[in-house]
Design a protein with these regions (language model features):
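Conserved small-residue-rich
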Residues: 138-198, 204-205
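Structural beta->alpha junctions
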Residues: 43-48, 92-93, 148-152, 196-199
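Short amphipathic alpha-helices within nucleic acid-binding modules
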Residues: 51, 93-105, 155, 198-208
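Glycine-rich beta-strand-turn "strand-cap" elements at beta-sheet edges
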Residues: 25-35, 75-84, 109-148, 176-189, ...
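Bacterial N-terminal signal peptides that target proteins for export
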Residues: 1-11
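Bacterial N-terminal signal peptides
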Residues: 9-19
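Short amphipathic alpha-helical segments
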Residues: 49-71, 106-109, 153-176, 210-214
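Ordered, small/hydrophobic-rich secondary-structure cores
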Residues: 26-100, 161
Length: 248
């Protein structure tokens, strides 16, 4: 789809290799080994104009972001049910790294030029729970789950989803990235980004015995759940902030 191709340049992870690594899980962390700053950005355009926002971003942002060592990843996808809405999982080394990115001359140009096409923008601060991915690869199929968990079950749910998502990236060569975040203001609300090699890889994972076990184990903990599907994606995995592990 043309809009996806245009917006792929806005997924500014640094002009990375597109070869696929063997099955392994590698966390995104700061140089000190801590979780980085994570947030979700929800960008909504006026009707039919998300592609124009993507064109602006592709023109003014990539060269600057590539030089920002603290801008780890900007993984963006377009909702299937609302192609005027893009969700980005943004990962920065620190608050200072985010400040550098958001106040750069290139970003200010992008923000000014997109204004005429922008219907809404929401930033959601979250804490990283699982930030695991392959060393390299290109994800074509992405899903988000929004889970609202019973307060008494938050710790257990976090333990189970962390173990399963880490296992999936570590053992399955077609699961490219698994990300779990919890809202800072509502720590019982979790948002995921699940990145797969392609649609077949996603279906295979969803039909796996391990994933079905995860569903059974967490069913009673979930108060509400929403699944968000996206148009075909082109997420190039970042290398910034990725701690390469040979064996985990």
């Amino acid at each position: 789809m043309q809009i996806t191709k245009k917006l792929s340049a806005l997924i500014l992870s640094g002009l990375l290799s597109v070869t696929f690594s063997t099955a392994n899980a590698n966390p995104i962390r700061t140089p000190e080994g801590n979780f980085p700053r994570v947030q979700w950005a929800v960008v909504e355009s006026t009707p039919g104009n998300l592609g124009k926002i993507g064109e602006i971003g592709a023109r003014v942002l990539p060269s600057t972001v590539a030089k920002e060592s603290g801008t780890y990843a900007l993984y963006g996808v377009i909702e299937k049910d609302n192609p005027d809405l893009m969700r980005l999982l943004e990962i920065y080394e620190s608050d200072e790294a985010y400040r550098i990115h958001s106040t750069s001359a290139a970003f200010q140009t992008y923000r000014a030029e997109r204004f005429q096409f922008l219907k809404g923008l929401k930033l959601l601060p979250v804490n990283g729970i699982v930030l695991e991915q392959k060393i390299d690869g290109v994800g074509k199929t992405v899903t988000t789950h929004r889970y609202e968990i019973k307060a008494s079950e938050v710790a257990k749910f976090q333990e189970i989803i962390s173990a399963e998502y880490l296992r999936a990236v570590k053992e399955n060569p077609e699961v490219l990235g698994m990300f779990v975040t919890a809202e800072q203001a509502n720590p019982n609300i979790f948002h995921t980004m699940e990145i797969f090699k392609d649609e077949t890889a996603q279906k295979n994972y969803n039909n796996s015995a391990e994933y079905k076990k995860f569903l059974r184990s967490t069913k009673s903990m979930i108060q509400a759940e929403k699944i968000i599907e996206y148009l075909p994606a082109n997420i190039v995995l970042t290398k910034k902030g990725v701690v390469q592990n040979e064996i985990r």
